[in-house]
Amino acid sequence: MLTVSAIAEKLGLKVVVKGDLSQIVSGCYISDLLSDVMAHSKDHELWITLQTHPNIVAVAVIKGISALLLTNGRNPEPATIKKAEAEKVTIMMSAHTTFELAGLLYSMIKDSQPPQAGPS
């Protein structure tokens, strides 16, 4: 299984707020609309977004998101950092684009899962 810590290390991500870095990451959800994340994300997913305001932390807590990943070198707002520290939500950031990170994470997550049995 893939952890937040392993992803941060392998991709050279800057960890801005250290929540539980041992959390499992089972998938990835990419969206900048909070309502979309609320409706469609799943427990233990990594959320990739451009959003930097404190509401992303609230959504991450409600949805059981393993960590937040901010792209394009975006820094979280000071209030977001404070809220994430209080809620123990990991926030990471990268200078990479959302597209680049999506591709890298897809490969990492796919490679970490056991092979599925095909037809006999």
Task: List where the protein language model places each region.
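Intrinsically disordered, low-complexity boundary segments flanking structured domains
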Residues: 1-2, 15
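Short, structural beta-strand-to-alpha-helix junction motif
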Residues: 2-4, 97
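Short secondary-structure junctions
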Residues: 12-18
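Feature captures the catalytic cores and cofactor-binding loops of soluble hydro-lyases/lyases
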Residues: 22, 31-46, 50-120
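Structured beta-strand/loop patches that form or line metal/cofactor-binding pockets in enzymes
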Residues: 26-28
